[in-house]
């Protein structure tokens, strides 16, 4: 059976960033590259261990989603994205493109909405790096 992997970019980026929060990875220019390093390590692990036939990395869109229009207070209590993560996003997108992996971003829809919609058409496998999410029912 062919395997399709759809990765939620921001879930991985936040996970990577906070994994190094006590010992951040700082480059020679003084920039925190923790999110970049952690994201690439996870991507490499998925590619090596799972050898997917197809893979895509799904990002949340800029400017919010239909939920923000329906309910302006949606996620209003969340803290602002850390500057180090905002700094990392263009680099991560460039790296993904360097791997020749599609970057998927659908206007008005969060990454998990896109992943859930696409997953309904495929057999769903959750790689070991995502063990905590195995309880999700699609």
Model-inferred region functions:
Residues 2-125, 130:
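Noncatalytic, basic helical substrate-engagement surface that gates or grips nucleic-acid strands
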Residues 128-132, 137-138:
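Conserved RecA-like ASCE P-loop NTPase motor core of nucleic-acid helicases/translocases
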């Amino acid at each position: 059976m062919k395997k399709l992997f759809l990765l939620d970019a921001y879930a991985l980026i936040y996970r990577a960033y906070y994994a190094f929060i006590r010992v951040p990875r700082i480059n020679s220019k003084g920039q925190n590259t923790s999110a970049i390093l952690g994201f690439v390590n996870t991507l490499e692990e998925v590619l090596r261990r799972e050898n997917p036939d197809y893979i895509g990395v799904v990002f949340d869109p800029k400017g919010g989603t239909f939920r923000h229009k329906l309910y302006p207070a949606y996620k209003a209590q969340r803290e602002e994205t850390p500057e180090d993560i905002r700094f990392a996003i263009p680099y991560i997108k460039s790296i993904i493109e360097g791997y020749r992996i599609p970057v998927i971003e659908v206007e008005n829809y969060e990454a998990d909405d896109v992943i859930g919609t696409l997953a309904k058409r495929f057999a769903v496998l959750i790689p070991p790096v995502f063990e905590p999410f195995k309880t999700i029912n699609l």
